[in-house]
Amino acid sequence: MAKKSKIAKAQKREALVAKYADKRAALKAAGDFIGLAALPKDSSPVRMHNRDLIDGRPHAYMREFGMSRLNFRQLAHKGQIPGVRKASW
């Protein structure tokens, strides 16, 4: 489980990215780089990092499922992820 402060910080960044997305796109299209520099740093989507939706773990993130490999493995063994089966060959 990630620290609550790290999870909260990531959520705050996501909110800032969503808030400034239209303004950032307009400034970028106009070529106003001074205006872009005046926006908050955390409003840039590059600064976002994928985190596990269940416990906030930042490493070993599986983009297709939105969770880390550890939670993916647990839920897959329980059969709670649709379309995922244990491999056998």
From Swiss-Prot:
Coiled-coil positions: none
One Gene Ontology MF term: structural constituent of ribosome
Listed GO biological process terms: translation
SUPFAM superfamilies: Glucocorticoid receptor-like (DNA-binding domain) (SSF57716)
A Gene Ontology term for the protein's cellular component: small ribosomal subunit
InterPro entries found in the cross-reference section: Ribosomal_uS14, Ribosomal_uS14_bac/plastid, Ribosomal_uS14_sf
Function: Binds 16S rRNA, required for the assembly of 30S particles and may also be responsible for determining the conformation of the 16S rRNA at the A site.
Assembly and oligomerization: Part of the 30S ribosomal subunit. Contacts proteins S3 and S10.
PANTHER family in UniProt: 30S RIBOSOMAL PROTEIN S14, SMALL RIBOSOMAL SUBUNIT PROTEIN US14M
Protein name per its UniProtKB record: Small ribosomal subunit protein uS14
Gene: rpsN
